[in-house]
Amino acid sequence: MNKLTQLQNQITRCKKCPRLVNYLEEIKKKYRTYWCKPVPSFGDQNAEILIIGLAPGRFGSNRTGRMFTGDASGEFLYKTLFEAGLCNKPAEVGFKPASVHAGDGLKLKNCYITAMARCAPPQNKPTPKELENCFSYFVEEVKLLKNVKVVVALGKIAFDGYLKWLCNDVLQKKGFKFSHGAIYKSKDLPHILIASYHPSRQNTQTGRLTPKMFRQIFKKALQYCYGTSNM
């Protein structure tokens, strides 16, 4: 078992946040088949593209135990990753939903998905303290992901969390501003940073984030990794 896998096992046993522990225990009483634990990261450990989300959805990855699995956000994300050649889900399944459960055979190619918070929070809003408790896991994870070239931050919390890591390790975050499609690339940065709206239903069902907009994000990521894109 390598260090990255060991870290994920450690994450699933975490009980640092009493509010979240109690919240998940209450959900588990009602839905006994739900995962209801911290959700580990998912993907290719040699990936060049790191995707950062916010937190598990109550009825998505909190239910299934795998990042972006079992809800509308996952359907939107994995459909786009398939179109980008970054996951193996066959087109004929129709992506309804794209990712059903942790044992459905889905595999990621050259991308790795993590999140700034590992437990489903009430109202999908982790507190600053809860984000801080998870941050050490993110720091360790990035250290172990040796091949990352491009970071795709899904939402402002993911974007700000990555900037916090930069401030600790590289530079001050002066000049960084979250906006969909913003790209930060510099010889002083360890990775190319691409900002995107989160594929939440609040964004996708209102048209704030369209499939075309999301495809453009991963088209850019592919271009920075390979020099070209098939999207």
Where are these regions (language model features)?
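A polyanion-binding, active-site-adjacent surface
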Residues: 2-182, 186-227
